[in-house]
Amino acid sequence: MVNFGAQSIRQTLVQLLGFAAIFTSSYMFYKGLSIVANSESPLVVVLSGSMEPAYQRGDVLLLWNRQKHVDVGEVVVYNIDGRTTPIVHRVLRSHASDNKQLLLTKGDNNAVDDVSFYGGRNQYLDREKEVVGVVKGYLPLVGYITILLAENQYFKYGLLGITGLLAFIQGE
């Protein structure tokens, strides 16, 4: 028979507080990293093979956005209005125009530059408005789990089931 006494409730509350502490600590670390790196997304997972062989699918990129100028050859992550997924590509050309830097990018594994990604509105990216950050480091394949969760429903539901089963078993 299951005992739902005061001890069981106390144990459940302690577990919930532990989960809340882990979640809030992780969130605070991420937000602190965002402030230090001056980037809304200081960690980005590579989702496509457009930057191979430099970066593989599943690599986690560490971004820095405190420099005013980006050099040709550096890898940047940028967002375009209307697109939900940031793009990771190398700077091919750089131009100064009206006190702002304009960039032309291209994936290492792509045949052509990214002008078609820019939506036909212009031929270059505005460094100040569209670049999320410059890649300063990476962790190989660490983010592959996010790709598996997004692309494989069996993996996602299997992981949720195992997590629920472990929580149930540990609760007894």
From Swiss-Prot:
One Gene Ontology biological process: signal peptide processing
EC assignment: 3.4.21.89
Keywords: Endoplasmic reticulum, Hydrolase, Membrane, Protease, Signal-anchor, Transmembrane, Transmembrane helix
GO cellular component, one term: signal peptidase complex
GO molecular function: peptidase activity; serine-type endopeptidase activity
Residue intervals on the Cytoplasmic side: 1-15
Residue ranges that the UniProt entry lists as topological domain Lumenal: 37-172
PANTHER family the record matches: SIGNAL PEPTIDASE COMPLEX CATALYTIC SUBUNIT SEC11
Subunit and interaction comment: Component of the signal peptidase complex (SPC) composed of a catalytic subunit SEC11 and three accessory subunits SPC1, SPC2 and SPC3. The complex induces a local thinning of the ER membrane which is used to measure the length of the signal peptide (SP) h-region of protein substrates. This ensures the selectivity of the complex towards h-regions shorter than 18-20 amino acids. SPC associates with the translocon complex.
Descriptive protein name: Signal peptidase complex catalytic subunit SEC11
